[in-house]
Amino acid sequence: DVDYDPLPAVADARAALAEDAAPVHDGAEHNLLAEFDMAFGDTDAAFATAPHVFRETFHQHRGGGHSIECRGNVATYDPLEDLLTLWSSTQTPHTARQLLCDMLGRYETGVRVVAPELGGGFGPKLIFYPEDITLAVAALILRRPVKWIEDRREHFIGTTQERDQFWEAEIATDGEGKILGLRGSLIHDHGAFTARGVNLPYESAITVTLPYEIPAYAMSVKLALTNKVPVTPVRGAGQPQGVFAMERLLDRAAQALGLDRAEIRRRNLVSGADMPKTKPLQNRGGGPVILDSGDYPKCQADVLARAGWDEFPARQQAARAEGRYLGIGMANFVKGTGRGPFESATVRIAPSGTVQVE
């Protein structure tokens, strides 16, 4: 028989940050995992003098990778070669090997990680899970192959997820829809444990400013622990959340100002003549946020022309007459890539005296 004692739990990141919230971890004084601010320009002045200010609250709910094949591992140990081999549905076999070496006190030559076809990864399979080390230890002890395949129910409660952010944001514009300032607060639900630090909300807080000209910006970010599955990168790694917040704010402003949604974006996009454009922010690799090339207004115009944006209202009305409802939306997204600064090299010296550099 198993006796269960119900314990207090928090499932809402906002409630988790309340002073009287039950701590997720025993001995912890609160559930605030981390907090930071991002800012440039004078937001107070921008909002104090702005003809228009639009405020919105967003909850971006949780989601997961939910690949066709769940996670799985097979571990074997060859005592003759003193070689531990782990076949794992991991997206990061080199990281997994290094972690196994660190945890088991083994040299890299004594650990091999093989990543076969994954059946879908999408981010959650970047993570090193307890099952990875558990199977490795079991194979070393038993001297037998050990296999574990995650079922779908386990996947929903044991594999990391993403999103789950609460935004309170406001945008200041002039009478023509030009952005004067952006500010707000972001609460990020981190789940019960941390596997990737602050990188997800950090990316969200950077991406919300792209690819528009924003003279002043301020965002307060808090990471909350909750009694939920941990949060790690999934398909975009924090960046879609920032895009969603900005694009919805622009839709709201366009509606209130009587502007076409595409036009308000065109008026605020960074122009090709201003490239490369350095944003006064720091990416998570420590370098500056640089929009290195492109003509964003032209890119938007080309896409809208191919999509038939100007002709869509006529199509919409024709469909409405037939009892059908058609809608169209748009968004601009600049994907951050090439982050650093980090490189690696391996030098191997064989007994024969030859040197191999990788």
Kindly give the residue locations of the regions a language model identified.
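Structural alpha/beta core scaffold segments of enzyme domains
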Residues: D1-E358
